[in-house]
Amino acid sequence: MKSYLVGGAVRDALLGQPAGDCDWVVVGADPAHMESLGFKAVGRDFPVFLHPKTGEEFALARTERKNGHGYRGFIVNADPTVTLEQDLQRRDFTINAIAHDQTNDTLIDPYGGVNDLEQRILRHISPAFAEDPLRVLRAARFMARLAPLGFSIAPETLTMMREMAASGELNSLIPERIWKELSRSLAYTQPAAFLHTLRTVNALEVVLPELNALYGVPQHADYHPEIDTGLHQELVSDMAAKLAPGDMLIGFAALCHDLGKALTPRATWPHHPMHEQRGMAPTQQLSERLKVPRDYQQLALIACREHLNVHRLSKLHDHTVYELLQRCDAFRRPERIAQLAIVCEADYRGRYGHEDANYPQGQHLCRLHAAALAVNARDLNRQDLHGTQIGEALAQARIRAISSTGVYDGGTRTNF
């Protein structure tokens, strides 16, 4: 029995990046032997064990053979005769097929992963890559993480990904797996690379058709020098990642904010009247299909509906600002306003030539919200108030608090 450190921990160490969880592969052992050493079996589809002291995952070396449709149609063989090289060969990319023997501090790299790391290439290991459609999404997600380091996908791997997209295999992916790869990409510094990669291999139209529909839809060049709405969406996604690193909630809301532009009549292009309202349905549809968590869905719908109101905040009446806060449920969920402000700033700055622009609307929205939030029912003289009068009085008090942050003169809010 011998164990090797494998996968992401080895790859990240060689890249000089912070390593995540340590995964180990065990050669020459069976489940009974692992359990006799105190390891706890946790694998459902293949033998995986938790170390009795560290809790790290140790998987028995295995091979996989395709015997059905989709990413679950595999026969797994995990017995003591499976070699390390055979186990590494079943993996997706060469950079993930490097093992570290810690007993003598050597690397086992049968498929050229170290060289591909040095050349900044994401390359599949073997034709078996095409047997698992999930790997198309994994490649896109890896690009969201690795593109900032200068990585690109090998031409032969792109070709195989296109063939996989054309085969219909991607239709077998369950919504939860698509969401998992999408949401993880939103935690990286360049989530637009996820979208760009999928679109390059014609997979975006299959797994995320609502987002794919934005490409080729023109916007007015005076406001959007990048013109293409799909490109704007990529810029906004990357800007959101810059403004709120690792925040997948904000990232998803930023991703959905302009979905309505794909539904505006062609006759109105490059203008998109009512795209905020039009975007609610595809945002809901996307969220429900992928089984997106409820808090993600709610913030995405808020951003879709309200982003133009935040952009023109200086033109809004005090009572209109209060109504905006109410629609966001901002008095019960105060965190939403700061989140919305970041999404709107990402939208504003996610345009060619506006990357470093100031966006005072975000800070001002937070100030208006803070002023209104500071007022509560306990502050009211409630002796002569009954029933709905209390709520009405509280609303008026909060509107006065909003007004106190600046003077609205019918055209522009001061102190902005």
From Swiss-Prot:
Monomer. Can also form homodimers and oligomers. CTP binds at residues 8, 11, 91, 138, 141. This is Multifunctional CCA protein. HAMAP family: CCA_bact_type1. It comes from Xylella fastidiosa (strain 9a5c). CDD domains: NT_ClassII-CCAase. Its EC number is 2.7.7.72, 3.1.3.-, 3.1.4.-. Keywords: ATP-binding, Hydrolase, Magnesium, Metal-binding, Multifunctional enzyme, Nickel, Nucleotide-binding, Nucleotidyltransferase, RNA repair, RNA-binding, Transferase, tRNA processing. Belongs to the tRNA nucleotidyltransferase/poly(A) polymerase family. Bacterial CCA-adding enzyme type 1 subfamily. A single active site specifically recognizes both ATP and CTP and is responsible for their addition.
